[in-house]
């Protein structure tokens, strides 16, 4: 993947403004609420019976923070995301058997939460385009083991 200077700047700039400890839990909770079939991968997380239960679930919040830690690794390795994510791809494919379409759903929820947080002034069309390109590269890297 080729990144322009403007794309790198937009991605790194947005990341610098995000609070991963806030956005990660929000995005994962949103994914579990909007796409309830994704809950099947989180059977050990306890009560996921309602939106309020999901939003207040500490295991959901912790895994949301873990997801954001993974995105931070991708940002620090933007020129080598596939290699950076190779172990995660193997784990999600071979051990956890996660449907790879769910990565795109979660990426979309991350984008929605970021857009809601920053609005059109902080999440304009150029930032959104770069951010979604970045997340699509991350999703592709996570799906690599599935091909």
UniProtKB/Swiss-Prot annotation:
CDD domains: Hb-beta-like (cd08925). The keyword rRNA-binding does not apply. Residues 2-147 form the Globin domain. One of its GO terms (molecular function) is peroxidase activity. One of its GO terms (cellular component) is hemoglobin complex. Red blood cells. InterPro entries: Globin, Globin-like_sf, Globin/Proto, Hemoglobin_b, Hemoglobin_oxygen_transport. Keywords: Heme, Iron, Metal-binding, Oxygen transport, Transport. Gene3D superfamilies: Globins (1.10.490.10). Heme b binds at residues 63, 92. One of its GO terms (biological process) is hydrogen peroxide catabolic process. PANTHER family: HEMOGLOBIN FAMILY MEMBER, HEMOGLOBIN SUBUNIT BETA-1-RELATED. Involved in oxygen transport from gills to the various peripheral tissues. Belongs to the globin family. Heterotetramer of two alpha chains and two beta chains. This is Hemoglobin subunit beta. It comes from Carassius auratus.
């Amino acid at each position: 993947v080729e990144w322009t200077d403007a794309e790198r700047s937009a991605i790194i700039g947005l990341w610098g403004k995000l609070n991963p400890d806030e956005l990660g839990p929000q995005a994962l909770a949103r994914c579990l609420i909007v796409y309830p079939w994704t809950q099947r991968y989180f059977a050990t997380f306890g009560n996921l019976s309602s939106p309020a239960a999901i939003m207040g679930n500490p295991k959901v919040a912790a895994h949301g923070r873990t997801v954001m830690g993974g995105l931070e690794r991708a940002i620090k390795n933007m020129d080598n995301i596939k290699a950076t994510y190779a172990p995660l791809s193997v784990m999600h494919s071979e051990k956890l058997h996660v449907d790879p379409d769910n990565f795109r759903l979660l990426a979309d929820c991350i984008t929605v939460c970021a857009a809601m947080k920053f609005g059109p002034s902080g999440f304009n069309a150029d930032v959104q385009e770069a951010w979604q390109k970045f997340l699509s590269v991350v999703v592709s890297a996570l799906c690599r083991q599935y091909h």
